[in-house]
């Protein structure tokens, strides 16, 4: 049996706390929560994080040996979210983000880092209200020539 994919989670707001709860409760098989980072360790998030390692700075997740993939749910176009994603991709760690603003501002920059390191940048949740349109375009419609996608 292969070991679980070890997640480093940055941001424990509404979405981040739900992700943590889902992983810790086993709803997502084959995944474990190795480390988390948030501004306030003492805030009640409605999920028991006592068994999870806390790091002081988001970039610590990118450097952690017990983290395979980063889930960035901090938000915003600047640091600490931007620095975390840059550091994680440069270190060869794949990143999952729902950060529309950061992707709009830095997508090309992040694509260059991702390509150079071989790490993936997954952002499906940031597009089309979370509808799996990116996967559909890449996989199910790969044989078609799509010239434009429009949305509101």
Indicate where each model-derived feature is located.
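Hydrophobic Val/Ile/Leu positions in short beta-strands of Rossmann-like dinucleotide-binding domains
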Residues: 7-9
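Glycine-rich Rossmann-fold phosphate-binding loop(s) that bind the pyrophosphate
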Residues: 12
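N-terminal Rossmann-fold NAD(P) dinucleotide-binding loop
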Residues: 16-17, 81
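NAD(P)-binding Rossmann-fold cofactor-contacting core
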Residues: 25-47
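General beta-strand structural signal in soluble alpha/beta enzymes
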Residues: 54-56, 71-72, 96-98, 121-125, ...
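Rossmann-fold NAD(P) dinucleotide-binding segment
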Residues: 58-98
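Rossmann-fold NAD(P)-binding glycine/threonine-rich loop
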Residues: 80-86, 90-91, 100-137
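Conserved anion/nucleotide-ligand pocket segment
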Residues: 136-152
């Amino acid at each position: 049996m292969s070991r679980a994919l070890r997640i480093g989670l940055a941001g424990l707001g509404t979405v981040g706390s739900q992700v943590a709860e889902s992983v810790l409760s086993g709803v997502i098989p084959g995944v474990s929560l190795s480390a988390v980072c948030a501004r306030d360790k003492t805030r009640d998030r409605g999920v028991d994080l006592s068994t999870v390692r806390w790091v002081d700075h988001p970039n610590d997740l990118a450097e952690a040996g017990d983290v395979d993939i980063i889930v960035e749910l901090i938000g915003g176009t600047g640091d600490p979210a931007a620095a975390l994603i840059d550091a994680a991709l440069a270190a060869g760690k794949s990143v999952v983000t729902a950060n529309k603003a950061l992707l709009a501002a830095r997508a090309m920059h992040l694509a260059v880092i991702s390509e150079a390191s071989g790490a993936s940048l997954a952002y499906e949740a940031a597009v089309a209200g979370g509808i799996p349109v990116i996967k559909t375009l890449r996989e199910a419609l790969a044989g078609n020539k799509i010239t434009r996608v429009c949305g509101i």
